[in-house]
């Protein structure tokens, strides 16, 4: 199964997991969003965490998401993006 099929097949489960953590507006960016992903590419997620979300909760969500999908993932929030990359990420981000 390629990376795009994996994402599609796990979409409902990802949304349930996100709901448990209060995560909203889940988008994908990076090589997967640009359709340039390779067999070992990770999946970059852009999300909105609830106000006051701790770094530990962020890390727990990322770990559980990676385990669910069976691939390395990176999870970023819009607020956590560096100013230099924010515009590019926002332009290429696509809804899950």
Indicate residue ranges for each PLM-predicted region.
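Catalytic metal-binding acidic patch
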Residues: 30, 35-54
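Metal-dependent nucleotidyltransferase catalytic core
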Residues: 1-4, 10, 49-81
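Helical scaffold of the NTase/Pol beta-like nucleotidyltransferase catalytic core
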Residues: 1-26
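Conserved beta-strand core positions
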Residues: 26, 43-45, 73
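Conserved strand-to-helix beginnings and helix N-cap segments that scaffold or border functional pockets
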Residues: 11, 40, 58-59, 86
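Short hydrophobic/aromatic patches at helix-to-coil boundaries
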Residues: 88-96
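Basic nucleic-acid-binding interfaces
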Residues: 15, 19, 53, 94
């Amino acid at each position: 199964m390629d990376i795009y099929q994996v994402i599609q097949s796990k979409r409902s489960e990802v949304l349930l997991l996100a709901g448990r953590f209060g995560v909203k507006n889940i988008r994908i960016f990076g090589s997967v969003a640009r359709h340039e992903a390779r067999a070992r590419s990770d999946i970059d997620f852009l999300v909105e965490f609830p106000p006051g979300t701790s770094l530990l909760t962020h890390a727990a969500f990322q770990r559980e998401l990676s385990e669910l999908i069976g691939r390395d993932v990176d999870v970023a929030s819009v607020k956590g993006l560096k100013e230099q990359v924010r515009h590019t990420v926002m332009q290429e981000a696509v809804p899950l």
